[in-house]
Amino acid sequence: MNNYEAVFILTPVLSDEQVKETVNKFKDILIAEEAEIINEENWGLRKLSYPIQRKTTGFYFLLEFKSDSTIISKLETQFRRDEKVLRFLTFRQNKVFMEYALKRRNKLKETK
């Protein structure tokens, strides 16, 4: 099993309820495939670097999880099919990045 990180941007026209519902949909896909969700972060509404589908802002989310590589194609297919997702990026964390992510999570816990 490998560690993965998925960052995705949702369209800004969604209500808070729709945003939570969409994020839970992707988390449910991971859980159904027996992935272990390590961390999730809501980065909130942020300005995009360039317009995407005539939108200049979007809701950013990060999911860190541990799973087999077979789940990635299923998750990315769902990202592509969902019209609420503007962009997404999923990648495998290497050893150095895993250490960095752990330090970042610990720092976030300390600030809360």
From Swiss-Prot:
<dbReference type="InterPro" id="IPR000529">
    <property type="entry name" value="Ribosomal_bS6"/>
</dbReference>
<comment type="function">
    <text>Binds together with bS18 to 16S ribosomal RNA.</text>
</comment>
<keyword id="KW-0694">RNA-binding</keyword>
<keyword id="KW-0687">Ribonucleoprotein</keyword>
<keyword id="KW-0699">rRNA-binding</keyword>
<dbReference type="GO" id="GO:0005840">
    <property type="term" value="C:ribosome"/>
</dbReference>
<comment type="similarity">
    <text>Belongs to the bacterial ribosomal protein bS6 family.</text>
</comment>
<dbReference type="GO" id="GO:0006412">
    <property type="term" value="P:translation"/>
</dbReference>
<dbReference type="Pfam" id="PF01250">
    <property type="entry name" value="Ribosomal_S6"/>
</dbReference>
<dbReference type="InterPro" id="IPR035980">
    <property type="entry name" value="Ribosomal_bS6_sf"/>
</dbReference>
<dbReference type="InterPro" id="IPR020814">
    <property type="entry name" value="Ribosomal_S6_plastid/chlpt"/>
</dbReference>
<dbReference type="GO" id="GO:0003735">
    <property type="term" value="F:structural constituent of ribosome"/>
</dbReference>
<dbReference type="InterPro" id="IPR014717">
    <property type="entry name" value="Transl_elong_EF1B/ribsomal_bS6"/>
</dbReference>
<dbReference type="GO" id="GO:0070181">
    <property type="term" value="F:small ribosomal subunit rRNA binding"/>
</dbReference>
<protein>
    <recommendedName>
        <fullName>Small ribosomal subunit protein bS6</fullName>
    </recommendedName>
</protein>
<dbReference type="GO" id="GO:0005737">
    <property type="term" value="C:cytoplasm"/>
</dbReference>
<keyword id="KW-0689">Ribosomal protein</keyword>
<dbReference type="GO" id="GO:1990904">
    <property type="term" value="C:ribonucleoprotein complex"/>
</dbReference>
